[in-house]
């Protein structure tokens, strides 16, 4: 309701508006046909196009190391998409994961309100302190990103989306995230709880 009200205020009856940017939510494009919407979207993506400097990474952690075995015991393995190891290897991306995690509602719903950034020396302690479901991903600083065996397609999609946004940022200090009250409201909204339960089956 608040979002719809905000959109209405922003438009203010202007019938010429065909693009609406919703902070931390996405973009709404209006058009007389699907082709018109597609054309507008292409113009937007062309203007915002930027080079991505990150590439595939592989982890250096040996499978017979105690840390690797500990991760396996908890149900984790190296993530399937090697690009996503950068989230645990590149300082700028680690900072995004740590400080700008709650970028948009779906991300919080499917991946939680904060990320688990693993420490090589304290990983066992970190995992033992979790009193709820284990997180779908662990970002082991300087090593790589690990996925839990129960991770769903929806959760993979959300992390890929986060990565696509993160690698295109020049100054993360300017990035707005969802507030604590917005996150609380979101995670306790019955409709979102139901939607998340459906996604876990995919």
Language-model features: locations:
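Glycine-rich flexible loops
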Residues: 1-202
